């Protein structure tokens, strides 16, 4: 089998796998979307609990942390990873993982927002965010990007303590990115919690599917 045929096979298998998973998730969320369109009392309670911590310094810190989950940061970060693995490390499959997970996570997030149609909180702390609220795009993209980074670290760093230390730092960053969206009152806590769960499930499914695909293609 030639290189062109293998490339076509890879693209076809990736698209088919992701389309299947997307269809299943879409069917599930379509059946439960109505109860989620409105925020819950717990969401408002969490806003109230955070209020005493609101001040100018914390506002600046939260704005910086939330930036680490924005597309303005994640797009260049993904591109750096792609070119690093493709051109420097010569590890094509890691590049494929980055591209596939980044794009599919974005598509899934946009699809779910349109399905649920939940409005954002009415009183943002500093500045209103655009788009719909559920699930949190920052939470989904933070889990899939930084979670993939953890996966890469597990396969790249041989020093146990350093690998564990960096993993803990990245997990803390993911949690803080989600918290920053609640602090800034641009998402309800339930938006963020759902984003974390969806992002983690999608990351695990994508990694498993791509690992199987890599094994299948390399065996040809």
Predicted regions and their residues:
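N-terminal transmembrane-helix/juxtamembrane module of multi-pass inner/ER membrane proteins
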Residues: 1-73, 115-121, 125-126
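Membrane-embedded catalytic cores of phosphoryl/pyrophosphoryl-handling enzymes
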Residues: 2-4, 122-220
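Alpha-helical transmembrane segments of integral membrane proteins
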Residues: 12-17, 93-101, 162-169, 194
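Alpha-helical transmembrane segments of multipass membrane proteins
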Residues: 20, 24-25, 29, 105-109, ...
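Membrane-interface helix-boundary motifs at transmembrane edges
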Residues: 35-38, 85-94, 157-161
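Hydrophobic alpha-helical transmembrane segments
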Residues: 69-86
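Interfacial segments of alpha-helical transmembrane regions
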Residues: 83-107
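Transmembrane alpha-helix/helix-exit interface in multi-pass inner-membrane proteins
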Residues: 102-118
């Amino acid at each position: 089998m030639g290189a062109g045929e293998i490339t076509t096979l890879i693209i076809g298998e990736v698209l088919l796998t992701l389309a299947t998973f997307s269809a299943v998730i879409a069917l599930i969320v379509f059946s439960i979307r109505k109860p989620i369109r409105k925020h819950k009392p717990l969401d408002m309670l969490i806003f109230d609990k955070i209020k005493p911590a609101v001040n100018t310094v914390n506002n600046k810190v939260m704005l910086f942390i939330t930036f680490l989950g924005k597309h303005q940061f994640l797009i260049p970060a993904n591109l750096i990873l792609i070119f690093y693995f493709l051109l420097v490390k010569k590890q094509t499959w890691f590049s494929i993982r980055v591209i596939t997970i980044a794009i599919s996570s974005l598509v899934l997030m946009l699809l779910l927002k349109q399905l649920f149609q939940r409005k954002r909180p009415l009183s943002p702390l500093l500045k209103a965010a655009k788009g719909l609220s559920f699930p949190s795009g920052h939470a989904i993209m933070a889990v899939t990007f930084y979670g993939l980074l953890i996966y890469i670290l597990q396969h790249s760093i041989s020093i146990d303590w350093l690998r564990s230390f960096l993993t803990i730092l990245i997990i803390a960053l993911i949690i803080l990115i989600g918290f920053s969206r609640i602090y800034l009152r641009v998402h309800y806590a339930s938006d963020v919690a759902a984003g974390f769960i969806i992002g983690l499930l999608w990351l695990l499914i994508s990694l498993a599917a791509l690992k199987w695909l890599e094994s299948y293609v390399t065996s040809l």
